[in-house]
């Protein structure tokens, strides 16, 4: 986790995102919405298409 303090003294927290290849998504990933929906069924909060081969990766906070 990265914590930043700006000039005004407020604190900003940025969480890292971990990616895991979807176990249920089949074929090339052409729709971010379809990928995210499959990731939801796997218990992840989000998912997106990534990489040269356009695979579906599920995202979660590390």
Curated annotation (Swiss-Prot):
InterPro entries: Defensin_plant, Scorpion_toxin-like, Scorpion_toxin-like_sf. The keyword Ligase does not apply. CDD domains: Knot1. Its main location: secreted. The keyword Ribonucleoprotein does not apply. Residues 1-15 form the signal peptide. It comes from the Eukaryota. GO terms for biological process: defense response; defense response to fungus; killing of cells of another organism. Gene3D superfamilies: Knottin, scorpion toxin-like. Pfam families: Gamma-thionin. Keywords: Antimicrobial, Disulfide bond, Fungicide, Plant defense, Secreted, Signal. It is found in: Secreted. Transmembrane segments: none annotated. SMART domains: Knot1. One of its GO terms (cellular component) is extracellular region. Disulfide bonds join 18-62, 29-49, 35-56, 39-58. Belongs to the DEFL family. This is Putative defensin-like protein 3. It comes from Arabidopsis thaliana.
């Amino acid at each position: 986790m990265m914590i930043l303090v700006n000039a005004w003294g407020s604190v900003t927290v940025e969480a890292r995102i971990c990616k895991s290849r979807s176990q249920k998504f089949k074929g090339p990933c052409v729709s971010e919405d379809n990928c995210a929906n499959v990731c939801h069924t796997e218990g992840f909060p989000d998912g997106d298409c990534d990489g040269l081969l356009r695979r579906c990766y599920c995202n979660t906070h590390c």
